[in-house]
Amino acid sequence: MISAAWSIFLIGTKIGLFLQVAPLSVMAKSCPSVCRCDAGFIYCNDRFLTSIPTGIPEDATTLYLQNNQINNAGIPSDLKNLLKVERIYLYHNSLDEFPTNLPKYVKELHLQENNIRTITYDSLSKIPYLEELHLDDNSVSAVSIEEGAFRDSNYLRLLFLSRNHLSTIPWGLPRTIEELRLDDNRISTISSPSLQGLTSLKRLVLDGNLLNNHGLGDKVFFNLVNLTELSLVRNSLTAAPVNLPGTNLRKLYLQDNHINRVPPNAFSYLRQLYRLDMSNNNLSNLPQGIFDDLDNITQLILRNNPWYCGCKMKWVRDWLQSLPVKVNVRGLMCQAPEKVRGMAIKDLNAELFDCKDSGIVSTIQITTAIPNTVYPAQGQWPAPVTKQPDIKNPKLTKDHQTTGSPSRKTITITVKSVTSDTIHISWKLALPMTALRLSWLKLGHSPAFGSITETIVTGERSEYLVTALEPDSPYKVCMVPMETSNLYLFDETPVCIETETAPLRMYNPTTTLNREQEKEPYKNPNLPLAAIIGGAVALVTIALLALVCWYVHRNGSLFSRNCAYSKGRRRKDDYAEAGTKKDNSILEIRETSFQMLPISNEPISKEEFVIHTIFPPNGMNLYKNNHSESSSNRSYRDSGIPDSDHSHS
């Protein structure tokens, strides 16, 4: 009795436990009706949702909620109870604040393409295990990031803030960050403290900002000892940055800036660098030995720069020829002087560098105010046409000296013709200047009609190349300082000199353009050689045709009279063509006579008959009928062959 009661008690206990566990199992396996659930992956994307649906299974690990219309009010508070969720995709929604109520253990959060404006400590502190944060294409600004917002994000490795409204790099970023993307913002300055302590940073992308050389702090990248990739594409740099971390840097991208010079120490100690890209800049020469420390370089890309292949670039030719096969260098193509335009620097002979040329120097003195120091925003100056080194070309320039009133500042200017349409202007300043205005005008043209061209050059520059001028034409070049130090000039009257471009006939380039350069059309004011040759051939052809026609017309009537039969053998088909009618006989031609042999059954006579040829040699008719009224059944062709079946001797 006791055992039976005990059995009933155990069965009741099991039933009770089953009833308690059953709802939990059903809940764990439930899925929102608007979503699709598959082994921890919850697919609620692209459904025009305005809020996150309830009833998400507790064993969910990844939530796909992108491409909806979810706003901040649509994030339920019970979402934070999903403790197994590690990845949430909420991009392309309608969030305007950093979302709260997120699962505590989320590691990867995608919030791109929303309208998030603020990042607070309260929102980030609730997800302390976050490793990847994607905030691209939002409205985050530097002032909208709360100070210390990331102080508890000790696991954050990737922070993407591309295409926002940042003007500076946010302070207080966690030391654990390995990749930081800040491209396409409005960053114009980077101070050293903003990147201080980011010793784990490996990849830094700053493309498409407003950075210039004055906006980069001294040694701003120097302490990033683990940095392997630095990208500064599409900024306003005029010189390559210096003091780069040399321990681990492997990739450096500087293309699409306004770089016109490379400091001699720019790439010092970058022994691990294997890819360097400086394409689409304004480089015309490189300081000697600039690549000496690049022991591991394998890809050097320098396309679309106005390289001036003068004496200062001869060392580059020697360096290129000494490189091993594994090193791939692209874009070192001469753009000037004209005689080597389109040629690869590596292929130039030593004589083409003109290392013995000398220039002609003109001196200009101007009066300026008391110097102080004011630096305008760099990067706002227009990109120069082409900057060239001090390559000298004798016999192409004239001395022009203009002297102003006595002053405390002297500018020494060199003006010389480089090609028939290019002049090179260089200058030296005794005292620092912030900016100068450079202009040029073809003499004989009125400035009122827009023929004058001017540009602003920074005080850091010392030379300028003016292109697209007219050959053998006089030009007036003027220069005036816009600012010296902190005070404006009392007198901004420009000081001008006159120069002259070289004649076109002095340049006759015979080079072949490289594949990467567009071939220029051949320009020649004279009649093209091909047209002359074609015309001559046409005239000769017409003359020959006329001569042939005249000859045929003259000799056509004599053709039949001059024809004579060959003494050789003729095929039987030739007789048919000549009008000969064949009988039951075989004609056998023997030299100048032929023999007729009957093929009848009668015995052949032993007597040999010889029939002489009746064909007259001159092709005239042999038979004449003096009686026109009498008819005849025989008639002769013009060739003397009778139409009858028998020949007559």
UniProtKB/Swiss-Prot annotation:
Signal sequence bounds: 1-28
Disulphide-bonded residues: C31-C37, C35-C44, C309-C334
Cytoplasmic side of membrane: 550-649
Membrane topology term: Single-pass membrane protein
Result for mutant: Y91A: Abolishes ADGRL3 binding
Effect of I452V: Found in a renal cell carcinoma case; somatic mutation
Post-translational modification: N-glycosylated. Proteolytic cleavage in the juxtamembrane region gives rise to a soluble ectodomain. Cleavage is probably effected by a metalloprotease.
PROSITE patterns given in the database record: FN3, LRR
Predominant subcellular localization, coarse grouping: membrane
Intracellular or extracellular location(s): Cell membrane; Presynaptic cell membrane; Endoplasmic reticulum membrane; Cell junction, Focal adhesion
Gene Ontology BP term (one): neuron projection extension
PANTHER family recorded: AGAP008170-PA, LEUCINE-RICH REPEAT TRANSMEMBRANE PROTEIN FLRT3
Physiological role: Functions in cell-cell adhesion, cell migration and axon guidance, exerting an attractive or repulsive role depending on its interaction partners. Plays a role in the spatial organization of brain neurons. Plays a role in vascular development in the retina. Plays a role in cell-cell adhesion via its interaction with ADGRL3 and probably also other latrophilins that are expressed at the surface of adjacent cells. Interaction with the intracellular domain of ROBO1 mediates axon attraction towards cells expressing NTN1.
Designated name of the protein: Leucine-rich repeat transmembrane protein FLRT3
Naturally occurring in which organism (per UniProt): Homo sapiens
UniProt gene name: FLRT3
